[in-house]
């Protein structure tokens, strides 16, 4: 492309300080260096993780910063050494990567790349420790290696999934984070058998994606657990057959679920990050074969406490990161699940706004009114 090797000026939504409205600015985006790719973003979605780091209540604030990590785009140019993608390819940026060289990448069991796994504090490129974004010479920091709230962004090639160019980017862009995390937690880690009983704790976007996984696996009973009763109606679209609100009972919810299911559920997936919900999700699975999978991120001081007999009675507890998907290897196959009409993505997309109205997307999520809001880069 004519822009290859040159600085590109474009619009980006910049977070200058915690909790303040994002500002649409003209930024300069430098060309990609070795093993980097410059992407033209066409659609980006808002994930709760973006809101969390925008609020910056519990972590080191890194500002000014360009947030955003769920997106779909087209390769504009590539840096030295990049052979996996070429200009014109359709890609999904991912907040974690796959170098294909480390022990994790070579293991069939892991997706936690030594080189490129998520780093929320790093605001620069891994190659030279510098930002590719500037405004009037001032560096603007990156976010989890993606920074998709910009018309152009620079990403390490290991954090890009090359996908079917026929796939609609305004739909499959949501597979770059939360939806794949929940879906994979069920399909790749919990692995419920057809006809089994599955409990999903927390019915936000990730929990509903885990529920979608249970539906695809053929579970016969899918029990949604949430303290907001309004979530049940929406959850039915994702296969939810029953709903339990812990607040409606005067005993621990794990006891309620054990009674409901004649001894416990076959599989549970916990998507809240609340440590008590994690304990409940583990203790509610059936002895002998039950498996609980933890997805939600806990507070740093949380302690998981349960009696060791729960393990000796052959209940299994697992954790997962990004649904155990390797970004480059596996995400293209998840896109194909959508293309084959197995995986339904439209029901996750509740809102769509032009990029210039990005603060509206934040407002919708803060009010709990949206699952996924898609932002169109071209107003």
Curated annotation (Swiss-Prot):
Binding site for an alcohol: 49, 69
InterPro entries referenced in this protein's UniProt entry, alphabetically: ADH-like_C, ADH-like_N, ADH_Zn_CS, GroES-like_sf, NAD(P)-bd_dom_sf
Chain residues that bind Zn(2+) 2: 99, 102, 105, 113
Cofactors (names): Zn(2+)
Positions contributing to Zn(2+) 1 binding: 47, 49, 69, 177
Matches recorded under CDD domains: alcohol_DH_plants
Compartment(s) where it occurs, according to its Swiss-Prot or TrEMBL record: Cytoplasm
Signal peptide region: none
EC number: 1.1.1.1
Catalytic activity from the UniProt record: a primary alcohol + NAD(+) = an aldehyde + NADH + H(+); a secondary alcohol + NAD(+) = a ketone + NADH + H(+)
Keywords linked to the UniProt accession: Cytoplasm, Metal-binding, NAD, Oxidoreductase, Zinc
A Gene Ontology BP annotation from the UniProt entry: formaldehyde catabolic process
Transmembrane keyword on record: no
Location, primary (coarse class): cytoplasm
Subunit description: Homodimer.
Anything else known: In maize there are two isozymes.
UniProt family annotation: Belongs to the zinc-containing alcohol dehydrogenase family.
PANTHER family: ALCOHOL DEHYDROGENASE (PTHR43880), ALCOHOL DEHYDROGENASE 2 (PTHR43880:SF59)
Name of the protein in question: Alcohol dehydrogenase 2
Annotated source species: Zea mays
């Amino acid at each position: 492309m004519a822009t290859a090797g040159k600085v590109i000026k474009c619009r980006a939504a910049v977070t200058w300080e915690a909790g303040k409205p994002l500002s649409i600015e003209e930024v300069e985006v430098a060309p990609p260096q070795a093993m980097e790719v410059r992407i033209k973003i066409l659609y980006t979605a808002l994930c709760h993780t973006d809101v969390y780091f925008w609020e910056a209540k519990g972590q080191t604030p890194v500002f000014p910063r360009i947030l955003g990590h769920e997106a779909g785009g087209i390769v504009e140019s590539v840096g030295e050494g990049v052979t996996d993608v070429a200009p014109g390819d359709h890609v999904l940026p991912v907040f974690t990567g796959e170098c294909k060289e480390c022990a994790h990448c070579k293991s069939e069991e892991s997706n936690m790349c030594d080189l490129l796994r998520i780093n929320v504090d790093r605001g620069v490129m891994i190659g030279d420790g510098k930002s590719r974004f500037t405004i009037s010479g001032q560096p603007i920091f990156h976010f989890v290696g993606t920074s998709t709230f910009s018309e152009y962004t620079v990403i390490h090639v290991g954090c890009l999934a090359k996908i079917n160019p026929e796939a609609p980017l305004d739909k499959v862009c949501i597979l770059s984070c939360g939806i794949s995390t929940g879906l994979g937690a069920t399909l790749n880690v919990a692995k419920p058998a057809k006809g089994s009983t599955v409990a999903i704790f927390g019915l936000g976007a990730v929990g509903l994606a885990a529920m979608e996984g249970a539906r695809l696996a053929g579970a016969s009973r899918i029990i949604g657990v949430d303290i907001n009763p309004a979530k049940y109606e929406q959850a039915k679209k994702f296969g939810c057959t029953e709903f339990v609100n812990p607040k409606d009972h005067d005993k621990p919810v794990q006891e309620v679920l054990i009674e409901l299911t004649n001894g416990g559920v076959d599989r549970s997936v916990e998507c809240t990050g609340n440590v008590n919900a994690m304990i409940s999700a583990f203790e509610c699975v059936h002895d002998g074969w039950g498996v609980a999978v933890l997805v939600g991120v806990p507070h740093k001081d949380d302690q998981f406490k349960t009696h060791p007999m729960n393990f000796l009675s052959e209940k299994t507890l697992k954790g997962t990161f990004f649904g155990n998907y390797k970004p480059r290897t596996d995400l293209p196959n998840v896109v194909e699940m959508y293309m084959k009409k197995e995986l339904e993505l439209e029901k996750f997309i509740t809102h769509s706004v032009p990029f210039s109205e990005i603060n509206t997307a934040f407002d919708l999520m803060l009010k709990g009114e949206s699952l996924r809001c898609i932002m169109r880069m071209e107003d």
